Amino acid sequence: QLKILNRLVVQYEARLIEAEAADNIIRIVSLSLRIADTKAITMALSIDRGDDSAYLKYLQAGRMDETVLLDVTPAYALLKPAEIARISALPIRVKLQYLMRDPLERLWSNVRMLAKRSLNEGQDFLVNCQDILQRVFYTQEETHIVTRGDHRSNIARFVAVFDRSQFQVGFAESLQDGPKFDSMCAYWGINATSARQIKPAHVGVAAPFPEGLRRDTLQFLKTQYDFVADNFADLPENWRKNRELLA
C-alpha cells in the first residue's frame, strides 16, 4: 500500500510540472491538493499501527461542524476478519454500506484499470484487457480481482462482525435512482442531493466488452449472480439482463 502511495506522489508531481508549464491554474491547485493529501495519508499509515489514532487524525483533518465522515474504497473487500473486527473496535461510531455492482461490469472495469496501468508502449489496450480477462478465469490468476467482486464472501465476513444497524448492503446502480439514493443518505444520516447531480468520478478508459468472452465470463460469475438473486429483491435491470443470458 505504501509503495503504491509513493508511486502516486511521483506521478502527481510529474503532472504538476506539466500543469505549471501550461499555466493551468485549476490543474495546479487540484494536483497540489492531491499531492498534499497523498503525503498525509502515507505519513499516517507509516506510523506504528498499534492503534489507528494517526489514521483517525488524518480522516478528521479540516473537520468543522460536519457530523459524518465518509471513507470510500473498494479495498475494504480485501479485509480479513481480524481487520474487520478492528474497524468495529474504533473509538467512533462506524456504519458501513457495501454497494454491489453488476459482476460482469465490475470485473470489466477492474480489468480495464489494470490494463491501463500495465500498458506498454505500442501495446494494444483492448488486447491487454482480453489477456488479463483470460488470465482471471482460465488460469485463475489476478485473484485479487475475483476477491474484490466476491459479493457472497465479502458480505459474509462483514455480517459476522456488524449487526444490521451498522452494516447495509445495496446496489451501486441505486446511486442513479432518486428514492433509493435518498434511502442511502438517510442511512448515512446526511441530506440527500438530487441523484441527477451525481457525476461519475474516476471513470476508466472506455472499451467494448469482447463478445467472444461474454458467455464464459458470465458462467464464471454465475455463483455471484445466483447469490444476489436469491438474497436480494429487485435486481437492477443490467443485472437481470446479464443473468438472463445464463439461462
Language-model-detected regions and their locations in the chain:
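Glycine-rich loops and low-complexity Gly/Arg-rich segments
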Residues: R93-Q97, N120-F125, N191-R196
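The conserved 3'-phosphoadenosine-5'-phosphosulfate
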Residues: R101-L104, N154-A247
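Short flexible/disordered coil segments
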Residues: C129-T139, F227-P236
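Short, structured helix-loop boundary elements
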Residues: T67, Q123-L126, R214, L218
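PAPS-dependent sulfotransferase catalytic domain
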Residues: Q1-S118, E141-P179, T223, D230
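Short glycine/proline-rich turn/loop motifs
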Residues: S32-K39, I132-E141, V205-G212
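Surface/interface recognition patches
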Residues: V136-F137, I145-R148, A192-R196, P200
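Mobile, glycine-enriched helix-loop/loop "lid" segments at the mouths of ligand-binding/catalytic clefts
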Residues: L114-D131
